[in-house]
Amino acid sequence: MKKIRENLFIQFLSFILLLLLIVTTVFTMNQYNAKKITRNNTLQLNENVLTQLIGKMDEMFISMQNLMSSVAYNPVVYAYYKEEEKRPLMQDDLKDVLINTLITDDYISGIELYNMEGNKLLGVGKKYTSTVSPEDINTIVYSEQILSDDGDNVKYAIYYPIYDLKNVQYFTKLGICVFYLSVENITDFLNEVRITDHTYLYVIDKELNLLAQNSIAKEDQDFLQNLEKIKDRYYVSEMKIDRNGWTIISYVPIT
């Protein structure tokens, strides 16, 4: 009888241990699946956010291009290029057109007009020095980094050719319109979205210069410097803006 009780106890104990093993396995699998689902959802959210940011920035460039077109072929601007002898009388009207354009867009810090010899006809806003020859600008061109004349701010230029509408078939250019893009406000795009509380967002240009970063990245200035040491703890995603070669990069912590 004693042996039977011992066998029953051993069987009961084995059953309990087996049950605990099953419960532990199920719990571990549930934890793993929950983490996997959370990770997949986070990565999908990251993909959606980057796509959204690309869309917003592309809309910004389209808006600026439309604005440049309206400036380049504004009757006052066009007449200023075509009727050289009347330029002194049109100076104030032309300046009003450029100033009104400047204040309608938060991303523009300066506007300049150049003739085909590369001489500046007029400029408003922050002063920069353009080194691009109008002869080389046949369509919209996005510049690399440009330093302002006072050395204080780095900006990017968008060059827009102005053609003689009466000689379009011969592609006769009158000059170029230059918009200087202020990149500080691009940070707002990055701060308007949220992936996780500890996700770093950056925008770099085609020369790998840093343009903008979200608030958490700005607070942690050592992050990029120590990237080689910590990059294995983050999912890294990149999306390029085809229009000008800029790239948005996200670092999502692995959990």
List the model feature ranges, each with a label.
Residues 1-36, 40:
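Extreme N-terminal signal-anchor transmembrane helix of membrane signaling/transducer proteins, especially
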Residues 23-26, 53-56, 60, 193:
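Histidine kinase transmitter module recognition
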Residues 28, 180, 251:
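Short aromatic/basic micro-patch
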Residues 44-139:
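Extracytoplasmic/periplasmic sensory segments of membrane signal-transduction proteins
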Residues 91-105, 135, 166, 174-218:
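Solvent-exposed, extracytoplasmic
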Residues 102-183, 189:
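Extracytoplasmic/periplasmic ligand-binding sensor regions of membrane-associated signaling proteins
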Residues 115, 148-150, 164, 196, ...:
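Acidic surface patches and DE-rich sequence motifs
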Residues 206-207, 215-255:
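Extracellular/periplasmic juxtamembrane segments that couple receptor/chemosensory ectodomains to their
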